[in-house]
Amino acid sequence: MIRSVVRGMGAALPRRIMKNADFEGMVETSDEWIVQRTGIRQRHIAADDETTASLGEAAARAALANAGLTPGDIDLIVLATSTPNNTFPATAVEIQNRLGMHHGFAFDMQAVCSGFVYAVTTADLYIRGGLAKRVLVIGSETFSRILDWNDRSTCVLFGDGAGALILEAGEGAGTIADRGVLAASLRSDGVHKDKLFVDGGPSTTGTVGHLRMEGREVFKHAVGMITDVIEATFSAAGISADDLDWFVPHQANKRIIDASAKKLGIAEQKVVVTVDLHGNTSAASVPLALSVAVADGRIKKGDLVLLEAMGGGFTWGAVLVRW
């Protein structure tokens, strides 16, 4: 059977690093307050010349170099983002052009922080359906553009960045020992749409708007939703938490990460955490964390890796991959 096998990874971060202490003169907060509640110590913030497209392009080029491929080898680009360069055309098309790729097709996917997990699942379906042999999956965000910098409950949480992964068609035996995407589960429930949202848009206010969040409400639902979708993914693959080599969760809040891992029985040493370095980068969160763990040698060929994310909507999901 056809499997979607990981061929390469890449990442890109804005030049500017903003430490927690930098917020102390802007809003009523402190490094201690932020670290205690979120685990975040710093985040990268895009300069005027750094955009979702430019960061996505840089991550894509890094992934291509890592895979030993060129843009000509890619059939499809799927970009997960909630902060596109323009309302239209899709920022994926702009990245396609920046890469000099004038064949195949490209589109954006919007599932907020769950975007990359949704995008990997979608890319897998295109590959297994025979419509693409190699897919460049990108998560790229510039959330700093939609933050209310006077709202201490949100402005300290988010950062900018991009990560990319290349999937390619490979042969598998149809067992859990296969390399590639092995199982996935996706969920959404719009009843929660007002708990995490942006208060603007072209069809409503004609403005970009700012991010708004009911933090306690998000936390209240997060752990249960995350563990349920992961357990569904385990069931689909016929495995348990003990079989995992690595858990790469959405990097939103260290307390949510810890509580989810504990509830699932995943050992702390198997959890990849980069929220302290990047903050919450929405759809870029999971591929950035993946890139760190691949680059430092933790994730190796043959490892069983679980990706998970939850975002506004609510949307949430999990993907199981044999590296």
Curated annotation (Swiss-Prot):
Q: Which reaction does it catalyse?
A: malonyl-[ACP] + acetyl-CoA + H(+) = 3-oxobutanoyl-[ACP] + CO2 + CoA
User: Which EC main class describes this enzyme?
Assistant: transferase
MF GO annotations: 3-oxoacyl-[acyl-carrier-protein] synthase activity; beta-ketoacyl-acyl-carrier-protein synthase III activity
Might you report a single GO cellular component term?
A: cytoplasm
Which Pfam families does this one have? ACP_syn_III, ACP_syn_III_C
| Annotated keywords | Acyltransferase, Cytoplasm, Fatty acid biosynthesis, Fatty acid metabolism, Lipid biosynthesis, Lipid metabolism, Multifunctional enzyme, Transferase
Location of this chain's protein in the cell: Cytoplasm
**Record keywords: Cytoplasm included?**
yes
- Main localisation, per the record? cytoplasm
What InterPro entries is this protein classified in? ACP_syn_III_C, ACP_syn_III_N, FabH, Thiolase-like
Q: Where on the tree of life does the source sit, at the highest rank?
A: Bacteria
EC code: 2.3.1.180
The annotated pathway is: Lipid metabolism; fatty acid biosynthesis
Q: Which residues cross the membrane?
A: none
Q: Does the keyword Oxidoreductase apply?
A: no
Catalytic residues at: C113, H250, N280
User: GO biological process: any one?
Assistant: fatty acid biosynthetic process
Region annotated ACP-binding sits at: 251-255
The record describes its quaternary structure and partners as: Homodimer.
Record note on domains: The last Arg residue of the ACP-binding site is essential for the weak association between ACP/AcpP and FabH.
- Family note: Belongs to the thiolase-like superfamily. FabH family.
Q: What NCBIfam families does the annotation carry? A: fabH (TIGR00747), PRK09352.1 (NF006829)
According to its UniProt entry, the function of this protein is described as: Catalyzes the condensation reaction of fatty acid synthesis by the addition to an acyl acceptor of two carbons from malonyl-ACP. Catalyzes the first condensation reaction which initiates fatty acid synthesis and may therefore play a role in governing the total rate of fatty acid production. Possesses both acetoacetyl-ACP synthase and acetyl transacylase activities. Its substrate specificity determines the biosynthesis of branched-chain and/or straight-chain of fatty acids.
The protein in question is named Beta-ketoacyl-[acyl-carrier-protein] synthase III
